[in-house]
C-alpha cells in the first residue's frame, strides 16, 4: 500500500522565483487568462502612513513630474514676424507730418555758405576755361578756313596763268613755222631812221 501511494504521488518540480512577469503555465491559464497580474510596490507587509502603489499593465498617466518638451526654435531662414496693431480712431488717410529738422548751429551755417561759395567759384572757373578754349578753337578754325581759301585762290590763279602761257606758246610756234608771211628782216625801207645830229 505504501508503495502504491508513493507511486500515485506526482513528483513536484523545484520552484524558482524570477523578478519580473511570471510565466503562464497550463494550470494558470484557466484561472488567470483574462486577468492582469498586480504587483505591490514597496516593502513587504503593510506600511504605516504610505499607501501601497499598484503596477498595472498599460500606458502610464501623465504627472506633473514628467519632463515637458522643450520648445523648438524657429528656422533661421524664415522672415521675422511683424505684428501691426490698429489703434482706436486711427484714420486711414492720415499722413504723418515729417519731423522738423534740427536747428543748425552758426558753425554749420558758415560751413554751408563757404561750401556754396567754393562750388560756385569752381563752376565759374571751369566754365571760363571751357569758354576761352572754345573761342581759341573757333579762331583757329577760322584762320585755317581763310588759309584754305587763299590756297585755293592761288591754285586757281596759277592754273589760269598756265593756260594762258600754253596758248601763247602755241601761237608763237604757229608764227615761227608759217612760211607764207614775208621776211620783214631784209625788206628795204624798214630800217629805222637815224636821228640827224645837232645843227650848227
Curated annotation (Swiss-Prot):
InterPro entries referenced in this protein's UniProt entry, alphabetically: BLOC-1_complex_su-3
Keyword Signal: no
Subcellular location, principal: cytoplasm
Subunit structure: Component of the biogenesis of lysosome-related organelles complex 1 (BLOC-1) composed of BLOC1S1, BLOC1S2, BLOC1S3, BLOC1S4, BLOC1S5, BLOC1S6, DTNBP1/BLOC1S7 and SNAPIN/BLOC1S8. Octamer composed of one copy each BLOC1S1, BLOC1S2, BLOC1S3, BLOC1S4, BLOC1S5, BLOC1S6, DTNBP1/BLOC1S7 and SNAPIN/BLOC1S8. The BLOC-1 complex associates with the AP-3 protein complex and membrane protein cargos. Interacts directly with BLOC1S2. Interacts with BLOC1S4, BLOC1S5 and BLOC1S6.
Cellular component, GO, one term: axon cytoplasm
Gene Ontology MF annotations: protein transmembrane transporter activity
Lineage: Eukaryota, Metazoa, Chordata, Craniata, Vertebrata
Record-stated family: Belongs to the BLOC1S3 family.
Modified residues (Phosphothreonine): 63
Organism: Bos taurus
Described purpose of this protein according to its UniProt entry: Component of the BLOC-1 complex, a complex that is required for normal biogenesis of lysosome-related organelles (LRO), such as platelet dense granules and melanosomes. In concert with the AP-3 complex, the BLOC-1 complex is required to target membrane protein cargos into vesicles assembled at cell bodies for delivery into neurites and nerve terminals. The BLOC-1 complex, in association with SNARE proteins, is also proposed to be involved in neurite extension. Plays a role in intracellular vesicle trafficking.
Location in or out of the cell: Cytoplasm
Recorded name of the encoding gene: BLOC1S3
GO biological process per UniProt: anterograde axonal transport; anterograde synaptic vesicle transport; endosome to melanosome transport; eye development; melanosome organization; melanosome transport; neuron projection development; platelet activation
Post-translational modification: Phosphorylated.
Keywords assigned: Cytoplasm, Phosphoprotein
The protein, known as: Biogenesis of lysosome-related organelles complex 1 subunit 3
Taxonomy, superkingdom: Eukaryota
Phosphoserine, modified sites: 65
Amino acid at each position: 500500500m505504501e508503495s502504491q501511494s508513493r507511486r500515485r504521488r506526482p513528483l513536484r518540480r523545484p520552484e524558482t522565483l524570477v523578478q519580473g512577469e511570471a510565466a503562464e503555465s497550463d494550470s494558470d491559464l484557466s484561472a488567470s487568462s483574462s486577468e492582469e497580474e498586480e504587483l505591490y510596490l514597496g516593502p513587504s507587509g503593510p506600511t504605516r502612513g504610505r499607501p501601497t502603489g499598484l503596477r498595472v499593465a498599460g500606458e502610464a498617466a501623465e504627472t506633473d513630474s514628467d519632463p515637458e518638451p522643450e520648445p523648438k526654435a524657429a528656422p533661421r531662414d524664415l522672415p521675422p514676424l511683424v505684428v501691426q496693431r490698429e489703434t482706436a480712431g486711427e484714420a486711414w488717410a492720415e499722413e504723418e507730418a515729417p519731423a522738423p529738422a534740427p536747428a543748425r548751429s552758426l558753425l554749420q551755417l558758415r560751413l554751408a555758405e563757404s561750401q556754396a561759395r567754393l562750388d560756385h567759384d569752381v563752376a565759374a572757373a571751369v566754365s571760363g576755361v571751357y569758354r576761352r578754349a572754345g573761342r581759341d578753337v573757333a579762331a583757329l578754325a577760322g584762320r585755317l578756313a581763310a588759309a584754305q581759301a587763299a590756297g585755293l585762290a592761288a591754285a586757281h590763279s596759277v592754273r589760269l596763268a598756265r593756260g594762258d602761257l600754253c596758248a601763247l606758246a602755241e601761237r608763237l610756234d604757229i608764227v615761227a613755222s608759217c612760211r607764207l608771211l614775208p621776211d620783214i628782216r631784209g625788206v628795204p625801207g624798214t630800217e629805222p631812221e637815224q636821228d640827224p645830229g645837232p645843227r650848227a
